[in-house]
Amino acid sequence: MHKKRWAAFVLAAALVLTGCSAGSFLHFGKGSGGSTVQKIDRPAVESAELQFAHPAAGDTIAVFDTSAGVFKAVLFPDKAPQAYDNFAGLVQAGYYNGLTFSRVESGFVVEAGQGADGKGTTIWNGNRYPAETTDSLHHYSGSLCMGTDASGECASVFYVMQTLPGEQSVTQELVDQMNSAGYRAEVVSAYQTAGGAPYLDYTDTVLGQVYEGMDVVDAIGQAAVDENQKPSEDITINSVSITQYE
């Protein structure tokens, strides 16, 4: 993909997304605490793209136990080896246990992984690693990604795409921009169903895909936040574990 064409796509995508809003995919109800919650109807994605294959026995998965519930993601270590090594090492060390979600943008992302210093760390004495990108993985709704700083490097911060499905986040104008930028037809089709943020492709690392508990991610995404987009009431990561799918 030509860099100039990609840069033009990113700019246009950002302009398109400023006009996106919640719509017919949202249904209102009451949570156990009496607060209003929104159930998002997320359609099954029929696609040969890697992220939409149900995990097979032996696949590597991450289990996130949070105060809002449990969600699970299949990981792709061979597609982002440094990101996986760092994430798995931090999980083994218990780094994420007890941390809270530090940034929530409803209909966009839920983010965690910052330490007390607000910067995060790595298993390499805090030394960051470059973002790993591939045409095999994209920022569809439900993708598990590593945060990237202004220098294009990553540490412990991760986020899950909480974008709305279909044209609620991927408009026809954005589809046209993807086609102009040279996206594969299969990827465009998957974005049209799942929703997502293609303007983050080839800049941020995609490590995995949530396959169970997306309703929990959606609940986190609806938390009331302060002026810094931090949940007003802590949403805590009780534990993260890495295991094999059975």
Name each region found by the language model.
Residues 2, 19-246:
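Cyclophilin-like peptidyl-prolyl cis-trans isomerases
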Residues 1-18:
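Sec-dependent bacterial lipoprotein signal peptides
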